[in-house]
């Protein structure tokens, strides 16, 4: 992947959608929920504060993150799906 996010944006590779229920039933494509977690694959330099100081990003490449259902912009690069979102759209870092 050859994407470099700008400012306080991050690129997240969403987790794969569940294929089966816990009971073993297969979920059709129309019934699958979008995953709300994934792995950060690229981060921008950070946000510029009002005083001109660069604020470092709290997430790093490789972080597993939890985000909102409608967070980010979906993009497809080289056949892979990603989300581009602001760091503030991320709710938590997992584990």
UniProtKB/Swiss-Prot annotation:
InterPro entries: Chaperonin_GroES, Chaperonin_GroES_sf, Chaprnonin_Cpn10_CS, GroES-like_sf. It holds the Pfam family Cpn10. Its main location: cytoplasm. One of its GO terms (molecular function) is metal ion binding. It is found in: Cytoplasm. The keyword Plastid does not apply. GO terms for cellular component: cytoplasm. Keywords: Chaperone, Cytoplasm. GO terms for biological process: chaperone cofactor-dependent protein refolding. Belongs to the GroES chaperonin family. PANTHER family: 10 KDA HEAT SHOCK PROTEIN, CO-CHAPERONIN GROES. HAMAP family: CH10. Heptamer of 7 subunits arranged in a ring. Interacts with the chaperonin GroEL. Together with the chaperonin GroEL, plays an essential role in assisting protein folding. The GroEL-GroES system forms a nano-cage that allows encapsulation of the non-native substrate proteins and provides a physical environment optimized to promote and accelerate protein folding. GroES binds to the apical surface of the GroEL ring, thereby capping the opening of the GroEL channel. This is Co-chaperonin GroES. The lineage of its organism: Bacteria, Pseudomonadati, Chlorobiota, Chlorobiia, Chlorobiales. The gene is groES.
């Amino acid at each position: 992947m050859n994407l470099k996010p700008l400012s306080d944006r991050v690129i997240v590779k969403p987790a794969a959608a569940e294929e089966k229920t816990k009971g073993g039933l297969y979920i059709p494509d129309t019934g699958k929920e979008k995953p709300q977690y994934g792995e950060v694959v690229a981060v921008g330099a950070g946000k510029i504060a009002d005083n001109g100081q660069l604020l470092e990003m709290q997430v790093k490449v490789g972080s597993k993150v939890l985000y909102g259902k409608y967070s980010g912009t979906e993009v497809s690069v080289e056949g892979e799906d990603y989300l581009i979102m602001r760091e503030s759209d991320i709710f938590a870092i997992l584990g």
